[in-house]
Amino acid sequence: MAEGSEKVPIARAGPEDVEQGLPPAYTAAVPPPGPGRLLKAGATVLIAGALLLLAGAIGAFYFWKATERQVYNVHYTMSINGKVQDGSMEIDAGNNLETFKTGSGSEEAVEVHDFQIGITGIRFAGGEKCYIKAQPKARVPEVDAMTKASLSSDLEDEIMPVRFDENSLIWVAADEPIKHNGFLSPKILELCGDLPIFWLRPTYPKDKQRERREMKRNKRQSESNFDAEHRAAAAEEVNTRSTPTQLTQDLGPQSNETRPMQQESDQTLNPDNPYNQLEGEGMAFDPMLDHLGVCCIECRRSYTQCQRICEPLLGYYPWPYNYQGCRTACRIIMPCSWWVARIMGVV
């Protein structure tokens, strides 16, 4: 009877099975999966893949829109010593960065302004060093498409003028590189790569230093003369204050008649617009903005500012000079009115 059974035991019941009351295992014929089950599995995989692709497309679209709003590039041309070179400016409002590139190939210079930490990084193509210097901290606001188009048209229509004075400020690298770079941002670390990083210190030629001392001396003298004249004028005003009553009466109606015209002209201008404030001399800019090269106070148009980055000569300072191997890095300088308008979000 056991030989004619269709079920063949493949394992004998062990002691554990006996204790647990489990029957011995038998082989059983498993039917193959039908085509309907395979179709369902394939449809599930296709639907899941389509949903993943749709989610990825939506995420990429929103990421592109956000990046397009916060980062934009402007290309321009400039003439340096009679040679026309290409330049570009990239403003990254999301990371509070500005990047300037000058030249191409072995003559390329890259300058990164990190307004978050207040440090500028400079690197030259083929150079063996990377340079950093301090800069003012600021906040780069987002710029809409209309402002991008107007700024691009202003910079791309003509060759940018270049200001490069041989007797101006010179940046000389320190003798030793920095030992710790933990205070630098990822963008500047990416710019420098594996190169040693050196601080830049400002240096003026000897003739320029003499001129600066003379300017400071003349400024102090002019301020002292102005104070003396101001005191004399104040004393004279006190002595003559009680006499010109008739002149005040004659000028009173005239000033009242012209006052509505003054108010009407003021209403035609937006008092919150920095450009209008500058026209009326109602906005004063810090001279350090111009000195540090952040913007130009007296300019109405942008221009390209070039600076010399030099290596220390390790000689006697300041005669005849203490630097060598100078290279040029250029970037665009905008008017201070445009700069302040950006910070205030007007443009």
UniProtKB/Swiss-Prot annotation:
Which domain of life, per UniProt?
Eukaryota
PTM per UniProt? After cleavage, the post-translationally modified ChM-I is secreted as a glycoprotein.
Where expressed (tissues)?
A: Expressed in the cartilage and in fetal precartilaginous tissues as well as in heart and eye.
| Glycosylated sites | N256
One Gene Ontology BP term is:
negative regulation of endothelial cell proliferation
Report residue spans for region: Disordered: 1-29, 208-281
Provide the BRICHOS domain boundaries. 103-200
The record's SMART domains line, in alphabetical order, gives: BRICHOS (SM01039)
Q: Where is the composition biased (Polar residues)?
A: 240-276
**One GO CC term of this entry?**
endomembrane system
Supply the alphabetized keyword list.
Answer: Chondrogenesis, Cleavage on pair of basic residues, Developmental protein, Differentiation, Disulfide bond, Extracellular matrix, Glycoprotein, Membrane, Secreted, Transmembrane, Transmembrane helix
Ranges that cross the membrane: 45-65
Q: What does this protein do?
A: Bifunctional growth regulator. May contribute to the rapid growth of cartilage and vascular invasion prior to the replacement of cartilage by bone during endochondral bone development. Plays a role as antiangiogenic factor in cardiac valves to suppress neovascularization.
Q: Please report which protein family the annotation says this sequence is part of.
A: Belongs to the chondromodulin-1 family.
**UniProt protein name:** Leukocyte cell-derived chemotaxin 1
| Species, as recorded | Gallus gallus
